[in-house]
Curated annotation (Swiss-Prot):
Subunit structure: Part of the 50S ribosomal subunit.
Entry protein name: Large ribosomal subunit protein bL31
NCBIfam families linked to this entry: L31 (TIGR00105), PRK00019.1 (NF000612), PRK00528.1 (NF001809)
InterPro entries named among the record's database cross-references: Ribosomal_bL28/bL31-like_sf, Ribosomal_bL31, Ribosomal_bL31_A, Ribosomal_bL31_sf
Binding site for Zn(2+): 16, 18, 38, 41
Gene: rpmE
Cofactor: Zn(2+)
Amino acid sequence: MKSGIHPDYVETTVLCGCGASFTTRSTKQSGQITVEVCSQCHPFYTGKQKILDSGGRVARFEKRYGKRKTTADK
């Protein structure tokens, strides 16, 4: 392996949207990474089902289509 061609590997803090944080190592020089979902709030790991609404898309969908009656209800 050639020496001097690999980036530095620094200690990095990962900050989640849920407020959790943990420390890992990365080549990103800022020392901080921001993520929307981590293992402490992801439904697969927590066993809870919740809707992750980014940008209000789910609310907009429910506003448009959520209260419509089906043909069987008429």
